[in-house]
């Protein structure tokens, strides 16, 4: 994914026009969110499980802390918690960088790049030719379970000339291939993003190498989609069960560059039907289609090849919407915490819901629990707890007109405040006093999401706190806000308060998170 804002920020850095940052003993490196070993990272690529190993590929500059020299970085894990850094998987070479794409298993060796005894794993990516700034689609393969990758000698598999009838930008805006095998039609499907045209194109192949255009999904064909949502990038597509029914539906997930609830880029998902050639979108509801109302959730993709015995659709995104501006010196960009994505009815509406994967419980320890306790205005709870890596869960019944506030990373003059305002059913994250916000005009302010009480009047909030981030999950996961924060080391306090009325705390669980 090539973002014009990123290019601008790279120039600012090259000119030495970076903003000052406060000193940090660990350079703000997260405790349990993935970061590259060093240098630049943007969105995840090619997420796939091979055997017992989860593979994370990501857009990476292995030589500098700014966007450029883009290749596929690589890390592996057996639990999605502890990551081992691996050598570059798909390198930039001969003036062609390796932009975003996806991976898939080729069990019947349709590509001919393995053999029947050892079928290959395939990775499709966008080749970005630096000299012309044009983009085409390319293929790499692995015959050693994803440890190493070889570029296909016949690249590109979709050239700019083949794209031309469907791309009015002359090869400048065709990228981020999502590829999967469509069981119903027996074909391989590729979904390409055309950011300059606000559309996706759908292609089919019998052998994963030779591709035929089939259809376009344009913004004008999606009933209810605002014309302000522009710059489509990083598509994903999959079937998702509708909880509580025997049905499944097709889902298209993508990252527009503009139009998100928090401003700028964000991730949305739409449901619809797919016949093997074209996707027909259901009418969208602007109040439920966005997967995150925070500023820092970009370029989400899902892991594939997850066994049916697991059954989860797990997604992750990059947490950074500010290019090279954040005040870190040895790294830029971090992965959101992996979360499950499901589709269910909440109240009277169908919602996408997300929850942190349960593996988080294996690396956390309870610090304090409360049950069936009423908090009143003037009280402060949890103030004895200190921590910069926490998992905080609060379930409560709010009085009419009350506002429950949870301050995290709290210090003498710093705090990030998560609030629930009962009168308008609003969940919010306030970064106004969160620490260093000078690095970007969008780094401060308040982000909000609608969160209704359940049928019994209960509100549930879960907050993942890390060195430089908060990720908030409201209700069953229908309201999510992910934001970067940059407080000082000493701002490690916690405070739970209420104003405007009481709140009955059904349960509170504060857990310390550590990979050690």
Curated annotation (Swiss-Prot):
Residues 1-23 form the signal peptide. It catalyses: Endohydrolysis of (2->1)-beta-D-fructosidic linkages in inulin. Disulfide bonds: none annotated. InterPro entries: ConA-like_dom_sf, Glyco_hydro_32, Glyco_hydro_32_C, Glyco_hydro_32_N, Glyco_hydro_beta-prop_sf. The keyword Signal applies. SUPFAM superfamilies: Arabinanase/levansucrase/invertase, Concanavalin A-like lectins/glucanases. GO terms for biological process: carbohydrate metabolic process; polysaccharide catabolic process; sucrose catabolic process. This is Extracellular endo-inulinase inuA. It comes from Aspergillus niger (strain ATCC MYA-4892 / CBS 513.88 / FGSC A1513). The gene is inuA.
């Amino acid at each position: 994914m090539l973002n014009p804002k990123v290019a601008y920020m790279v120039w600012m850095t090259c000119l030495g026009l970076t903003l000052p940052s406060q000193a940090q003993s660990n350079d703000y490196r997260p405790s349990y969110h993935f970061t590259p070993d060093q240098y630049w990272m943007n969105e995840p690529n090619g997420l796939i499980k091979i055997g017992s190993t989860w593979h994370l590929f990501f857009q990476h500059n292995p030589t500098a802390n700014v966007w450029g020299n883009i290749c596929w970085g690589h890390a592996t894990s057996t639990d999605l918690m502890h990551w081992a850094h691996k050598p570059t998987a798909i390198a930039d070479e001969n003036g062609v960088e390796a932009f975003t794409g996806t991976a898939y298993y080729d069990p019947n060796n349709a590509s001919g790049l393995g053999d029947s005894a050892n079928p290959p794993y395939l990775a499709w990516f966008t080749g970005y030719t630096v000299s012309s700034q044009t983009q085409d689609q390319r293929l790499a393969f692995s015959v050693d379970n994803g440890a190493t990758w070889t570029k296909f000698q016949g690249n590109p598999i979709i050239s700019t000339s083949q794209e031309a009838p469907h791309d009015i930008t002359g090869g400048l805006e065709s990228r981020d291939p999502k590829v999967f095998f469509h069981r119903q039609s027996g074909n391989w499907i590729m979904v390409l993003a055309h950011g300059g045209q606000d559309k996706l194109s759908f292609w089919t192949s019998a052998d994963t190498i030779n591709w035929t255009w089939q259809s376009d999904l344009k913004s004008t064909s999606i009933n209810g989609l605002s014309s302000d949502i522009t710059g489509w990038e990083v598509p994903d597509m999959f079937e998702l069960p509708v909880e509580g029914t025997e049905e499944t539906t097709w889902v298209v997930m993508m990252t527009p560059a503009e139009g998100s609830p928090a401003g700028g880029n964000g991730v949305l998902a739409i449901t619809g039907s797919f016949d093997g050639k074209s996707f027909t979108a259901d009418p969208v509801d602007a109040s439920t289609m966005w997967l995150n109302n925070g500023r820092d959730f970009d370029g989400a993709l899902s892991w594939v090849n997850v066994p049916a015995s697991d059954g989860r659709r797990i997604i992750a995104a990059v947490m950074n919407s500010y290019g090279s501006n954040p005040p870190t010196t040895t790294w830029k960009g971090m992965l959101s915490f992996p979360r499950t994505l499901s589709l269910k009815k909440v109240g009277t509406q169908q919602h996408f819901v997300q929850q942190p994967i349960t593996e988080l419980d294996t690396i956390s320890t309870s610090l304090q629990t409360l049950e069936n306790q009423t908090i009143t205005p003037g009280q402060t709870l949890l103030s004895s707890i200190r921590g910069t890596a926490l998992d905080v869960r609060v379930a409560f019944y709010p009085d009419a007109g009350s506002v429950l506030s949870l301050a995290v990373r709290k210090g003498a003059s710093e705090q990030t405040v998560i609030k629930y305002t009962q009168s308008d059913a609003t969940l919010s994250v306030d970064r106004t006093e969160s620490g260093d916000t000078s690095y970007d005009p969008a780094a401060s302010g308040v982000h909000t999401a609608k969160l209704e009480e359940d049928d019994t009047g209960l509100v549930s909030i879960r907050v993942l706190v890390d060195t430089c981030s908060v990720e908030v999950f409201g209700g069953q996961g229908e309201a999510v806000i992910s934001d970067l924060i940059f407080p000082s080391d000493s701002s490690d306090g916690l405070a739970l308060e209420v104003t405007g009325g009481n709140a009955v705390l059904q349960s509170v669980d504060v857990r310390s998170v550590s990979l050690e």
